[in-house]
C-alpha cells in the first residue's frame, strides 16, 4: 500500500497541508458519487435483495456481538457510526438497548445527516464531517461502525488516516465493526474492493475476525424478486458472497 511522505502528516498524526488538499479532492468526488446513488431505487431497503441482505447481516452481527460479550454492554456503550447515512444502524442499536445520548453518527453528505436527524431519536448526535479527523468528538468509544466506507475511498492515504482515527477513538477493550465488500465491480470505477490483506494493513497489530456475507448483488437482486428462500439458500454458499462482516480489536 502506498504510504504518504512524512510531510503529509503532522507530528500528532493529523493531516498536513498535502494530505488535507488530497483528502478534500477525494471527499468532493465521494460526495458527487453518493449524491447520485441515493436516487437509485436499487439501494432502497424495500428492494427485496437489500431487505434480505440487511436481515442476514443484522442476525450475524448480533451473533458476533454476543460471541465477544458485547451484547450485555450495549446499554452503557458509546457507539460511533462512521458514514452513518440515514442512521439505520444507530436506530437498530437503540432498538437493541443502546442509550441514544451515547450514540454519534458522522457522514460526508449533509442531506444524509439531515435525514438521520429527522428519523432518529433526538438525543443521538449527528455531524456532517470527514472521518479523517475525529478530534472534535469528545471521549472514546466502545464500538466504532463502518459500512462500505473504505471501498468508496480510492485515495490510499485517506483510507489509512481514517483507519488510524477509528483506532485512536476506540477504547482499549473496544471493537470496530467492519462491513465492506472484497470483490471489485468492473462496472463501477468509483469503488474498489478491499481484501483481507489490505484490512490487516489498515489495522496492524489488531485481532481481526472476518466472515463472508451477502450474496453477490448482481445474482441476488433478480433471485430475491422471485424467491426469498432461494436467495437465503444461495447466500449460505460462501464463494457466492461478496462482503466481509467482521470484528476488529486492539491487541
Give, region by region, the residue ranges found by the protein language model.
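A short SAM/SAH-binding and catalytic strip from SAM-dependent methyltransferases
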Residues: 143-157
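A C-terminal cap/extension of S-adenosyl-L-methionine-dependent methyltransferases
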Residues: 197, 211-251
Amino acid at each position: 500500500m502506498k504510504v504518504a511522505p512524512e510531510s503529509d502528516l503532522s507530528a500528532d498524526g493529523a493531516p498536513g497541508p498535502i494530505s488535507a488538499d488530497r483528502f478534500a479532492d477525494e471527499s468532493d468526488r465521494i460526495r458527487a458519487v453518493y449524491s447520485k446513488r441515493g436516487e437509485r431505487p436499487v439501494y432502497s431497503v424495500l428492494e427485496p435483495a437489500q431487505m434480505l441482505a440487511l436481515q442476514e447481516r443484522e442476525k450475524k452481527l448480533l451473533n458476533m456481538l454476543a460471541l465477544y460479550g458485547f451484547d450485555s454492554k450495549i446499554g452503557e456503550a458509546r457507539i460511533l457510526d462512521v458514514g452513518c447515512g440515514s442512521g439505520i444502524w444507530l436506530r437498530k442499536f437503540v432498538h437493541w438497548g443502546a442509550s441514544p445520548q451515547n450514540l454519534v453518527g458522522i457522514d460526508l453528505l449533509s442531506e444524509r445527516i439531515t435525514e438521520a436527524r429527522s428519523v432518529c431519536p433526538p438525543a443521538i448526535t449527528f455531524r456532517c464531517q470527514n472521518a479523517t479527523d475525529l478530534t472534535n468528538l469528545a471521549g472514546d468509544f466502545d464500538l466504532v461502525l463502518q459500512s462500505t466506507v473504505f471501498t468508496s475511498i480510492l485515495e490510499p492515504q485517506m483510507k489509512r488516516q481514517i483507519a488510524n482515527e477509528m483506532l485512536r477513538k476506540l477504547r482499549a477493550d473496544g471493537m470496530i465493526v467492519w462491513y465492506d465488500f472484497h470483490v471489485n465491480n468492473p462496472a463501477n470505477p468509483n469503488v474498489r474492493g478491499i481484501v483481507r490483506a489490505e484490512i490487516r494493513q489498515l489495522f496492524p497489530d489488531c485481532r481481526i475476525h472476518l466472515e463472508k456475507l451477502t450474496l453477490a448483488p448482481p445474482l441476488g437482486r433478480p433471485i430475491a424478486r422471485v424467491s426469498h428462500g432461494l436467495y437465503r439458500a444461495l447466500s449460505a454458499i460462501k464463494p457466492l458472497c461478496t462482503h466481509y462482516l467482521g470484528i476488529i480489536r486492539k491487541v
